Design a protein with these regions (language model features):
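Cell-envelope/extracellular polymer assembly enzymes that use nucleotide-activated donors
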Residues: 14-18, 46, 220
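C-terminal catalytic/acceptor-binding lobe
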Residues: 10-11, 28-31, 188, 210-303
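Short beta-strand-to-loop acidic/aromatic patch adjacent to the donor-nucleotide binding site
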Residues: 106-118
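Active-site-proximal specificity loops/subdomain of glycosyltransferases
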Residues: 58-102
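Short beta-strand/loop segment that forms part of the nucleotide-sugar
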Residues: 44-57, 81-85
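A conserved acidic beta->alpha catalytic loop
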Residues: 25, 50-65, 115
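N-proximal low-complexity "stem/linker" segments adjacent to membrane-targeting elements
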Residues: 1-38
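Conserved catalytic core of nucleotide-sugar-dependent glycosyltransferases
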Residues: 100, 118-209
Length: 303
């Protein structure tokens, strides 16, 4: 039984969490419920959940549980977008870009539906982008445009929870000891979540929509922003709630070879060539125009 509890929420009003979603199994449904309750109870922020499927499992099965667990002001932070589609392929990069264009905050967060960070990691990541990185010798803050809030290597805490341990975690105000015996340290590389300055994210091409389904988009994004922007990564842990995998989340998907070829092409480009590619690739030009149009619409509405 999930309980409503009111706890202190930290203000992350300048951030929008972007969560692409397809609920393909019972454990994926449990994961999105857990993640959203964690975000909504701990932070005052903005969340977009973009679901694409034949029917909205989020609306029929997730929302009732969220309404039971969250206070009205917490639940109101979630914007749910549903796109009806019979296409089996999950085009994650396209959904993320749709949400980035719709977002109206300085910071956008590419956020998987099954991850949890320590509270301080969220706060630090947003602060770095808004205020820069303060050098220890007293120099002016260095600009930060992208944050990876977890380390490279054994910083992933893989968790295989049960319904009971998830309920205990939530009802204990998120005591991670609720998962005792259900976790192991594992490899963390480039996925999970990233915090971006929204304008920089759009300028540098956001998610490359030519990566379809699963594979190599995380590697390419990390390479690109390290080459062309200002990135910080710090050695914190990240919890990954495990789940059943279909080909949409594994290397057996039918787009994997095309994704690999694109990654092999981009990874050897010089900074100049990489920048030129993202200045001219068609999807990115369309997205930048959408961002301009969206900004003009917001300005006229505010006026």
């Amino acid at each position: 039984m999930l309980e409503q509890k009111e706890i202190v929420r930290y203000g992350l009003d300048d951030a929008t969490f972007m969560i692409p979603l397809r609920i393909e199994s019972a454990d994926r449904m449990r994961n999105i419920i857990t993640t959203l309750i964690y975000l909504c109870r701990n932070f005052r922020t903005n969340i977009i959940v973009y679901e694409i499927d034949q029917e909205s499992i989020f609306k029929s099965a997730v929302v009732p549980q969220l309404e039971q667990a969250l206070l009205p002001e917490e639940f109101s932070m979630i914007t749910h977008i549903f796109e009806k589609s019979d296409d089996y392929t999950f085009h994650r990069t396209r959904l993320l870009n749709d949400m980035a264009i719709a977002a109206q905050t300085k910071v956008v967060v590419n956020y998987d539906s099954d991850i949890i960070l320590p509270q301080l990691s969220y706060i630090k990541a947003v602060d770095f982008i808004l205020n820069g990185y303060n050098a220890e010798d007293g120099r002016p803050p260095e600009p930060v445009k992208c944050v990876y809030p977890y380390g490279f290597g054994e910083y992933q805490i893989q968790c295989t929870p049960t319904d009971e341990s998830v309920s205990n975690f939530i009802n204990s105000n998120f005591d991670f000891n609720a998962f005792e015996g259900q976790t192991r340290k594992w490899d963390a590389k480039y996925g999970f979540c990233q915090f971006f300055d929204r304008e920089e994210y759009i300028r540098l091409g956001m998610e490359n929509e030519n990566f379809i389904s699963y594979g190599y988009e995380d590697d390419e994004r990390y390479m690109r922003f390290n080459a062309l922007s200002n990135v910080i990564r710090y050695n914190g842990d990240i919890m990954h709630l495990e789940h059943t995998r279909t080909s949409n989340s594994w290397f057996t998907n039918p787009h994997i070879e095309e994704n690999r070829s694109l990654w092999e092409k981009l990874r050897v480009m010089s900074k100049g060539k990489l920048s030129e590619y993202y200045d001219n690739v068609e999807y990115a030009k369309v997205r930048r125009q959408q961002a301009l149009d969206n900004g003009q619409e917001q300005s006229s509405t505010e006026a």
